[in-house]
Curated annotation (Swiss-Prot):
This is Elongation factor Tu. Residues 174-176 are annotated as: G5. InterPro entries: EF-Tu_GTP-bd (IPR041709), EF-Tu_GTPase (IPR050055), EFTu-like_2 (IPR004161), EFTU_2 (IPR033720), G_TR_CS (IPR031157), P-loop_NTPase (IPR027417), Small_GTP-bd (IPR005225), T_Tr_GTP-bd_dom (IPR000795). Residues 136-139 are annotated as: G4. Residues 60-64 are annotated as: G2.
Length: 410
């Protein structure tokens, strides 16, 4: 029997379930796979399978994440669900599982809770651009007015964090009732059961409301330099993995970071495994031959990019998860003016943490291992940085924190 080929006929979108503990994220994930499996568009996954999420390592941090996949008429989805709250925080900050959109699950019986708020804030900070809401456990609320109040509360909370609270689709239903119906009759079709129809209605909203992301290959070219060689008679070659976009010989690029001034040059050749390549694409490991550039002028940690697409910066705000002692992090707290290294793309840059802020905007004096915190950083050298970019915080070569750039200051 030949292995099934992965058909790339539909656009691919990465999503995930977020929300407070016990509001039904994993049950909803199971319900979606079961409802779509009834139409032959997914493999049905039980709650227990999803809940027993395997451990993964991302930037040296262990995270439990379950991955499921399914299709609708329009798209192919990869969906992440995390068993524990700490896993969500780590997942969203490290970008271990990239999310193009999220399904925020809120229990209609309880309304928004502290982690509901925290996940909305995190989605905003780490750049999950669009959310759709599933108001779960509708079967446990008899009072229609109460449902409307909870919906209003969710919309206000979304608006508070600068999501378009008035426009976001909210679908009411019961993930558990849908799972029970599909467990009894796995072949339920659309129109056979109200609870299952509500799950399908949710997926219709996700299809319509969460835009298809721009593919890496269509974004402006960027490659972080890993190594630099000089080839006699040919010039200087910079090697690295193309992060996004594409590159051909003859195109103009900028070399950005570390030095005060950005340098413009022309790519005279693209090579892979010592062979000339017509075009380098996102994901390729290539060598770029650069016109009129001396080996001394460029180094690891700079990036080569489409002119004007990225600028060097020294000051930014980051949302950071600080590793616990058990995760290999620090054993002791740190304070203002702490000076670790910030590992960005391919290099470590020393920076000073000038202040710490809690979720409510109040100043924090001391940061403990295991905390999630917003920090303002000043680097000693300018580096090509953009919003949504991931970084690690290191001390003597070991990772003590993971972060994402939430705002550029200068």
């Amino acid at each position: 029997m030949a292995r099934a080929k992965f058909e790339r006929t539909k656009p691919h979108v990465n999503i995930g379930t977020i929300g407070h503990v016990d509001h039904g994220k994993t049950t909803l994930t199971a319900a979606i796979t079961m409802a779509l499996a009834a139409q032959g568009k997914a493999k049905a996954r039980k709650y227990a399978d999803i809940d027993a999420a395997p451990e993964e390592k991302a930037r040296g941090i262990t995270i439990n994440t379950a991955h499921v996949e399914y299709e609708t008429d329009d798209r192919h989805y990869a969906h992440v669900d995390c068993p524990g709250h700490a896993d969500y925080v780590k997942n969203m900050i490290t970008g271990a599982a990239q999310m193009d959109g999220g399904i925020l699950v809120v229990s209609a019986a309880d309304g928004p809770m502290p982690q509901t708020r925290e996940h909305i804030l995190l989605a905003k900070q780490v750049g999950v651009p669009n959310l759709v809401v599933f108001l779960n456990k509708e079967d446990m609320v008899d009072d229609e007015e109460l449902l409307e109040l909870v919906e209003l509360e969710v919309r206000e909370l979304l608006s508070e964090y600068e999501f378009p609270g008035d426009d976001i689709p909210i679908v009411k239903g019961s993930a558990l009732k849908a799972v029970e119906a599909l467990t009894d009759t796995p072949t339920i079709k659309k129109g056979d059961n109200d609870w299952v129809d509500k799950i399908l209605a949710l997926m219709d909203e996700v299809d319509a409301y969460i835009p298809t992301p721009e593919r890496d290959i269509d974004k402006p070219f960027l490659m972080a330099i890993e190594d630099v060689f000089s080839i006699s008679g040919r010039g200087t070659v910079a090697t690295g993995r193309i992060e996004r976009g594409k590159i051909k010989a003859g195109e103009t690029v900028e070399i950005v970071g570390i030095k005060e001034k950005t340098k413009s040059t022309t790519v005279t050749g693209v090579e892979m495994f010592q062979k000339t390549l017509e075009e380098g694409l996102a994901g390729d490991n290539v060598g770029l031959l650069l016109r009129g550039v001396q080996k001394e002028e460029i180094e690891r940690g700079m990036v080569i990019a489409k002119p004007g697409s990225i600028k060097p910066h020294t000051q930014f705000e980051g949302e950071v998860y600080v590793l616990t002692k058990e995760e290999g992090g620090r054993h002791t707290p740190f304070f203002k003016n702490y000076r670790p290294q910030f590992y960005v793309r391919t290099t470590d840059v020393t920076g000073t943490i000038v202040d710490y802020t809690a979720d409510d905007g109040s100043a924090v004096e001391m940061v403990m291992p295991g905390d999630r915190i917003k920090m303002t950083v000043e680097l000693i050298n300018p580096i090509a940085i953009e919003q949504g970019m991931r970084f690690a915080i290191r001390e003597g070569g070991r990772t003590i924190g993971a972060g994402v750039v939430s705002k550029i200051i200068q």
